[in-house]
Curated annotation (Swiss-Prot):
Residues 542-603, 658-721 form the SH3 domain. Residues 431-453 have a biased composition (Polar residues). The lineage of its organism: Eukaryota, Metazoa, Ecdysozoa, Arthropoda, Hexapoda. Residues 11-289 form the F-BAR domain. Detected in larval body wall muscle. Detected at the neuromuscular junction, on motoneuron axons and axon terminals, at synaptic boutons in the periactive zone surrounding the synapse (at protein level). Detected on motoneuron axons and axon terminals, at synaptic boutons in the periactive zone surrounding the synapse. In the autoinhibited state, the SH3 domains are bound to the concave surface of the F-BAR domain and prevent promiscuous membrane binding. Upon heterologous expression, the isolated F-BAR domain is localized at the cell membrane, and causes the formation of cellular protrusions. Contrary to F-BAR domains from other proteins, causes membrane flattening on giant unilamellar vesicles (in vitro). Binds to membranes enriched in phosphatidylserine and phosphatidylinositides, such as phosphatidylinositol 3-phosphate, phosphatidylinositol 3,4-bisphosphate and phosphatidylinositol 4,5-bisphosphate. The keyword 4Fe-4S does not apply. Pfam families: FCH, SH3_1. The gene is nwk. GO terms for biological process: membrane organization; negative regulation of synaptic assembly at neuromuscular junction; neuromuscular synaptic transmission; positive regulation of Arp2/3 complex-mediated actin nucleation; receptor recycling; regulation of actin filament polymerization; regulation of synaptic assembly at neuromuscular junction. Adapter protein that provides a link between vesicular membrane traffic and the actin assembly machinery. Acts together with Cdc42 to stimulate actin nucleation mediated by WASp and the ARP2/3 complex. Binds to membranes enriched in phosphatidylinositol 4,5-bisphosphate and causes local membrane deformation. Required for normal structure and function of synapses at the neuromuscular junction. Plays a role in synaptic vesicle trafficking. Required for the release of a normal number of synaptic vesicles per action potential. This is Protein nervous wreck. InterPro entries: AH/BAR_dom_sf (IPR027267), F_BAR (IPR031160), FCH_dom (IPR001060), FCHSD_SH3_1 (IPR035460), SH3-like_dom_sf (IPR036028), SH3_domain (IPR001452). It comes from Drosophila melanogaster (Fruit fly).
Length: 1075
């Protein structure tokens, strides 16, 4: 056959070639079957002429010698051992039988039993299997036609685009030459030439970009087609030929060897003749016979490969990413191809396992699968699995060829391949689902749609229909290889969602009486238990405790459970340890749910899970636990906080890092080399080094049971000496039952008349107007308090356990904090703090700092790392109200004392719940006492406060220097505070304070400052600090804003966003006339 033409349709030529190949394969099989039939008939007829052996054998031998035998020549080369194909040997057999016809009387019976019968069975099987094999190769050829058809399409498009681009390039070159010569025609000026040059240049760039894209498509389709051709020739065609042969060469050789051996035993007279037949038959091999067949049928040896055909001397021969759009498209293509390779590898492994299982069942005598007796037989299943493996291998080969093509073009495909392989390893612990919710122990993950639910009144078949897996779609070449978009998220109707929410609300109301208050935990008992060294008690498997669903979740796998927001559930197990728990609903259905979707009942959990294992489970679903890092580390959020119940936020006990590192095995691993370790899941390994080969290639060196070796880091997880996994920040989670303590400075001793008055007013503001809130709509009128006031959030830093006694009260040396009125009442009501005399004649003008704590519900997931705070356009929706003259709160100013550091609070993620309308933040102010000031400062303060006019106080702008670098250099006492502040809030200062109406500033001669905090859409309070100190500079204390909009999920609608913007946590530090 001639090679494919350089010009023309590839598909047409390929179809003709494949048709001829199928015909020759069928002819080859027919020849083999004819040969088997000839051997069988020959043996039978020899047996029939036993009595007249000599005469009849001579006649028969001559008959078959005269028959037209395929003249497949032998390969004869100088210096090469003489060899024969099976047709030549058969011809030798006939010739020798013609001479030795009389010696075959004794061997007729042996021939009849061992040759004739088996040859008939083999021939019938070959005829039957040839039909299936030829049908299969035709289907494979059709797939190859599609791939080559893509080459024709992309080639045509490339030639068209390149022709256009080439013409425009020539035209642009002519215009540029005319411009260089500055010579126009009689009817054309230089200006018109310049305009034409600009127009033609822009058109040239556009057409070159199109030509480049068409060339890239052509190169990619060419690579895929060539890879498919390689696969077809080396695998599909060879497999079909082997299947059709069914060891016919070996069987024929066996038959002929048997003939020769029998004849030698029966007749010494024929020893020489049949010795020759035997020797030739022993040299029969499939390889040599195929070589002879290839020589006789050259079309079977024709292997087609396509080369890139450049258009108009195009110098580019590979994929290029010269243009931005091409680079982006090729990068996306590389990512999709890498994902397809990993996917096809997984499919090959899975189908190979199924194929091995079916083959073992067939070898054991089974005809059908015992697990599927009504299904197809094992042979059909085996063929299906083989075909699936073949398809997967073909797709994998094409994808790898395209990846290599992209790699040759300078595209970074190795990064995507590594990422796809890592994702494949990480997803081994869960069943395959592209939209299943996967979370870690910290509760961070993709927040599912808030309106996902199930209706308990519907039939179970509807729920099963929602989770039914979709059939895999066949993707074309120009589509993405990723199948993540083939499974859209199922969203029920709004009416069904509202009915389910109403049903769950009524169920919540009936069971709310049994909920525990997390603030009533016996902290003293918890401390005593922590001090004791108790043995680790394994968690009982049958422990059951109640919990509440914080969000709705639709099951994506058969082993998961669909839950509705506020639904009462029972947790019956810890799941597989990757952020899932096994729960049971009121209908008795059990399944896995994400643990951070649950709000656990602490009392029930405490009674059900005792000891260390209980604490571990409770820490997974704790109401709130916040990690704090001080030494320039990012703040992390470990879990979620229920908006209905506020728990104690604690700073964790920092882990004392050891010089020895440990890791625990997540999977079994068998060593593949002498320098590797073999271990099983759960083994604890001591890490020697993380750069086993001198570079960070993902292999670690460790010690297990006294044996040293290397192992992959992907199958292990770092842990401590006890085998407990380490958290992301390297610190252990704090014990959930630790008691809250205060770490604030001593409170000032206010005059009795003011202290009593402030306490009464604060109590009235917090609890006086609870019944006026609109619970149904979630709207809180001005001046109205929330229906329920959660306790304030308290802070505990490491080393502060000694600040409280066992009963939770401050020690005698630390006076209790005094309460001051917070700006939570209606406008027009306020309080004024004035100086007074303390007992013992000491100077009582010691107010230097005030701390405002607002506790409110905030969303659970912090996905607003790249959002501004507040969001764009929100500052206009909530304008800052002017300062009221009736709401000043004047405090003393001491310029020589820097503020002491406050305990810092990290943003606490809490779920977004629309049902908690009416929850309103609680504000508490703690006044901090500083050392007494002298008489001159008191006089200066008195004069400044009496003469200051609140009406003249301007609204502060955003601070340009929030950290007051100059003040940091002059203040020694405040250095610790600012170091801690910068470490925790420098990263998110711009996002946290962008758009807030209010600021701070200070000058050398003192000043007046104000700040308004917008809480629940109204002015919640103002803090105005005035003072005068000539020649002294004010030290501006940095501001802290914790929580708020930065962690609101993206899928909340506009009214939900407005609701959560009303619940913020602000910290304001007042010291020396600064906000």
């Amino acid at each position: 056959m001639q090679p494919p033409p350089r010009k023309g349709n590839y598909v047409k030529f390929l179809k003709n070639l494949h048709t001829e190949q199928v015909a020759k394969l069928q002819l080859k099989n027919q020849h083999e079957c004819d040969l088997l039939e000839d051997i069988r008939q020959f043996t039978i007829k020899r047996s029939a002429v036993e009595k007249s052996y000599s005469e009849s054998l001579l006649k028969i031998s001559s008959q078959y010698l005269n028959k037209k035998i395929p003249n497949i020549p032998d390969i004869k080369m100088e210096g090469m051992e003489e060899r024969w194909n099976m047709w030549s040997v058969w011809r030798t057999v006939l010739e020798e039988n013609e001479k030795l016809a009389r010696a075959r009387l004794a061997a007729i019976e042996v021939f009849q039993q061992q040759i004739a019968d088996e040859a008939k069975v083999l021939r019938d099987y070959k005829l039957a299997i040839a039909k299936r094999s030829l049908a299969g190769i035709v289907n494979v050829q059709k797939e190859l036609h599609l791939s080559v058809g893509d080459v024709d399409k992309t080639k045509k498009s490339y030639f068209d685009e390149e022709h256009c681009a080439h013409d425009v390039r020539d035209k642009a070159r002519d215009i540029e030459e005319k411009l260089k010569k500055k010579k126009g025609s009689f009817f054309q000026s230089i200006t018109s030439l310049q305009k034409n040059s600009a127009r033609v240049t822009s058109r040239k760039e556009l057409l070159e970009e199109k030509s480049s894209g068409a060339r890239n498509d052509y190169v990619l389709s060419l690579a895929a087609a060539n890879a498919h051709q390689n696969r077809y020739f080396t695998v599909d065609l060879q497999t079909t030929m082997t299947t059709m042969e069914n060891y016919v060469f070996e069987r024929v050789a066996e038959y002929l060897m048997l003939m020769g051996r029998t004849e030698l035993l029966t007749c010494s007279a024929t020893q020489n003749s049949f010795g020759k037949i035997r020797d030739q038959a022993q040299q029969l091999t499939r390889e040599y016979n195929l070589q002879c067949c290839y020589l006789f049928y050259p079309v079977l040896k024709q292997h087609i490969q396509y080369d890139f055909e450049a258009c108009d001397n195009d110098p580019v021969r590979k994929v290029t990413a010269e243009h931005e759009s091409a680079a982006e498209t090729l990068t996306k293509e590389a990512k999709n191809l890498a994902g397809r390779v990993v996917k096809e590898n997984a499919s090959i492994r899975e189908n190979a396992k199924k194929l091995a299982l079916c083959q073992s069942l067939r070898d054991s005598g089974q005809r059908t699968d015992p697990n599927d007796p009504n299904g197809p037989d094992l042979d059909t299943k085996i063929e299906e699995f083989r075909d699936q493996i073949r398809r997967s291998e073909t797709e994998k080969t094409k994808a790898e060829a395209c990846l290599q093509c992209l790699r040759d073009g300078g595209i970074n495909v190795d990064e995507w391949v590594q990422e796809a392989e890592n994702m494949g390893v990480q997803e081994l612990t869960r069943s395959a689902s592209s939209i299943s919710m996967r979370t870690d122990a910290s509760g961070q993950g993709e927040n599912p749609s808030s309106d996902s639910f199930y209706d308990s009144d519907k039939e179970e078949t509807q729920a099963a229909a929602q989770t039914k897996p979709k059939q895999e779609q066949q993707l074309s070449r120009d589509r993405t290889f990723s199948d993540s978009e083939d499974e859209p998220e199922v969203r029920p109707s709004a009416a069904a969602a509202s009915s389910a929410a109403a049903a769950s609300s009524s169920m919540m109301a009936s069971s709310a009486g049994g909920w525990d208050d997390p603030t009533e935990v016996n902290w003293g008992a918890g401390e005593e238990e922590d001090d004791k060294d108790e043995p680790i008690v394994p968690e009982p498997k049958e422990a059951i405790f109640k919990c509440t669903a914080l969000y709705s979740y639709t099951a994506q796998n058969p082993d998961e459970l669909t839950i509705v927001e506020n639904e009462q559930l029972e947790v019956v197990g810890e799941g597989d340890g990757d952020g899932w728990l096994r729960a049971r609903n009121y209908r008795g259905e059990e399944g896995y749910v994400p643990h951070n979707y649950l709000d656990i009942d602490q009392e029930t959990a405490g009674s059900a899970f005792n000891g260390t294992s209980g604490n571990q489970l409770r820490s997974q679903i704790s109401f709130s636990s916040v990690d704090y890092t001080v030494d320039n580390e990012d703040q992390t959020v470990d879990s979620m906080q229920s908006p209905d119940q506020v728990s104690v936020i604690m700073a964790p006990q920092k882990r004392v890092k050891s010089d020895v590192e440990w890791c625990i095995a997540l999977y079994d691993y068998d060593a593949t080399a002498e320098d590797e370790l073999t271990f099983e899941e759960g083994d604890k390994i001591k890490i020697i080094t993380k750069t086993a080969h001198g570079v960070d290639d993902g292999w670690w060196e460790g010690e297990l049971d006294g044996k040293f070796g290397n192992f992959p880091s992907l199958v292990v997880e770092e842990c401590d000496e006890m085998g407990e996994p380490l958290s992301e920040g390297g610190d252990e989670s704090p014990p959930p039952t630790a008691a809250p303590t205060f770490a604030l400075p001593p409170a000032p001793a206010l005059p009795p008349e003011y202290a009593h008055e402030l306490e009464l007013e604060l109590t009235e503001d917090m609890f006086g107007s609870q019944d006026t809130a609109d619970e149904d709509s979630g709207y809180i009128p001005n001046g109205a308090a929330a229906p329920s006031i959660p306790p304030p959030v308290l802070i505990q830093e490491p080393g502060m356990e000694d600040d409280l006694s066992d009963d939770g009260q401050p020690p005698p040396s630390l006076p209790p904090p005094q309460l001051a009125k917070a700006g939570g009442s209606a406008p027009g009501s306020g309080s004024k703090v004035e100086k007074g005399a303390a007992a013992g004649g000491a100077n009582t003008l010691n107010l230097g700092m005030a701390q405002i704590i607002v506790t409110a519900a905030t969303p659970m997931v912090e996905d607003g790392a790249d959002k501004s705070f507040p969001p764009v356009g929100e500052s206009d929706a909530q304008p800052v109200e002017p300062v009221s003259k009736e709401q000043p709160a004047e405090v003393a100013k001491k310029p020589d004392i820097a503020p002491k550091p406050l305990a810092k609070v990290a943003p606490q993620s809490a779920p977004a719940k629309e049902g908690n309308a009416g929850v309103r933040p609680v504000v508490s102010i703690t006044l901090t006492e500083y050392p007494s000031c002298d008489a001159e400062d008191q006089q200066s303060f008195s004069e400044g406060t009496d003469s200051a006019s609140v009406a003249d106080v301007p609204v502060l702008q955003d601070a340009e220097d929030p950290f007051n670098e100059k003040a940091k250099g002059e203040s020694g006492d405040g250095s610790g505070f600012e170091a801690n502040f910068e470490a925790n809030f420098d990263a998110n200062f711009d996002d946290a304070f962008a758009g807030i109406g209010g600021g701070g500033g200070g000058g050398g001669g003192g000043g007046e400052q104000s700040n308004e905090l917008d809480i629940n859409g109204e002015a919640a309070g103002e803090a105005i600090v005035s003072g005068s100190a000539a020649g002294d500079e004010d030290i501006e204390a940095p501001k802290q804003v914790v929580g708020g909009r930065a962690s609101i999920p993206e899928e909340l609608d506009s009214n939900q966003l407005a609701h959560y913007h009303e619940h913020e946590i602000y910290y304001v530090d007042y010291s020396h006339g600064q906000l």
